[in-house]
Amino acid sequence: LNGKLVFAGMGIVLGATAWAAEFQVEVRVNVQRGCQLVGQERGAGVEQLGVLDFGSGPRLDGPEGALGAALPATRRPRLECNPDTPYQLRVDGGQHGGVGEVRYLAGAAEHSKPIAYRLYQDAARRIPLPVDVPVSGRVPSSGSVDLPLYGRIEPLAEIPRVSRYSDLLKVTVTW
């Protein structure tokens, strides 16, 4: 009987042997170039970047010089991308045509003449944004680029008719 218990005990010890195996798991992510436009209201259809508002006044020939407008700094659109991503910004001629560096605001009143205006890339209004000419750049290491638009109406020789003058631009950003 002692022999049977010893043999049975050895079976329990031999049956409790554990086997082990080691495996590897590769972990990875592929970061691709991409961008997203932030800082503007979201809605259905075409996104709205903001309003270039030249304000109100009876004349456009005042002693203070040209009228200026800029997208509001509180909501200025910005392109966020992987660093070193190339991008282009293009602004069309608007609803009322535009040639070279000049675009036009059209009045709602009958017989109102269009008012010429120009767009610029900088607050000093020295670097123009010509009609349908792409402006190229590269995203800096910060991964963020402001997309400012500045406008200017030069003093007019004629007093314009009373009206609300407006234009609608299409801004295309590609990367």
Model regions: which residues?
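N-terminal small/polar-rich segments of proteins
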Residues: 20-104, 109, 137-175
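Solvent-exposed strand-loop boundary residues in beta-sheet-rich modules
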Residues: 123-125, 175
